[in-house]
Amino acid sequence: MTDTPDPAAVLSPAVKAAVLSEALPYIRRFHGKTIVVKYGGNAMTEERLQRSFAHDVVLLKLVGLNPVVVHGGGPQIDDALRRIGKQGTFVQGMRVTDAETMEVVEWVLGGQVQQDIVMMINEVGGKAVGLTGKDGMLIQATKKLMVNKDDPSQPLDIGLVGDITRVEPAVVKALQDDQFIPVISPIGYGEDGTAYNINADVVAGKMAEVLGAEKLLMMTNTPGVLDKGGKLLRSLSAQTIDELFADGTISGGMLPKISSSLDAAKNGVNSVHIVDGRVPHCLLLEILTDQGVGTMISSH
């Protein structure tokens, strides 16, 4: 089966010039600003979308923005677990993580997945550097305490899943100042050195807050947030989100994504979007054009 051509490759010179002209005011507006991108879903597994993502990130850096990538890797973790005869289990969108699973998470995310992303960005002209929470004490964490959403009196033990207690941004800012693109694996570490698996959406949201990011973009395998009828919701307020949580419209893996997005919006991130990672060049479309490709989250 042949690869689907990149849409950008078949544009006429006139159309490309028009696109660049449209991007100019956005480049001016966001020059020097930090953009945090949660990279996950199909965009991580389909070759043409991988290329599109890498080119977008490098272009954003070259025109003066400061992209920071926080990546997931759920399918890769599931594959690795299957190879050792384990089945992944989730509770309220969080992966149950015993000690053996945590070992797999560390070498899959901090090794295989992270290095693949770093290499991919570097191959198209960027300078990416991989980080985990241990590097520069970037992500400090403690064991996550959860309760049954249907019965808050019942605690849930989901193993070595972490809550972020502190983000130390110095190492990220130093890399940005030297024109590197940080690629962050969502692994935190406790005071005693215990490694914790942290949901990548949560890490991306907290990183955007601490870095004072202009934008947070969460890449997904859907057009954005959908209502019960499958219709795209182009914008969500805090009140609407509460209603969608209550009636079950937002559930599973979308729960931490929306919660983290709303927290980021409430804590100073100017623009938060859930974007369709299946759309080639979705980052450029969302950041540098008038055409949005997802759902905007507002704290109001």
From Swiss-Prot:
**Subcellular localization, as worded in the UniProt entry:** Cytoplasm
Q: Which CDD domains match?
A: AAK_NAGK-C
Q: Please list the GO terms describing molecular function.
A: acetylglutamate kinase activity; ATP binding
Asked if the Swiss-Prot or TrEMBL record annotates the protein with the keyword Acetylation, the reply is no
- Main subcellular localisation: cytoplasm
Q: What class of enzyme is it?
A: transferase
Its Enzyme Commission number?
Answer: 2.7.2.8
Q: Which residues bind substrate?
A: 73-74, 95, 197
Q: Does the keyword Secreted apply?
A: no
User: Origin, by domain of life?
Assistant: Bacteria
> Keywords on this record?
Amino-acid biosynthesis, Arginine biosynthesis, ATP-binding, Cytoplasm, Kinase, Nucleotide-binding, Transferase
GO CC entries: cytoplasm
Read off the HAMAP family from this record.
ArgB
Q: What protein family is recorded?
A: Belongs to the acetylglutamate kinase family. ArgB subfamily.
Among PANTHER family, the record links this protein to:
N-ACETYLGLUTAMATE SYNTHASE, N-ACETYLGLUTAMATE SYNTHASE, MITOCHONDRIAL
Q: What is the purpose of this protein? A: Catalyzes the ATP-dependent phosphorylation of N-acetyl-L-glutamate.
The molecule here is called Acetylglutamate kinase
Corresponding gene? argB
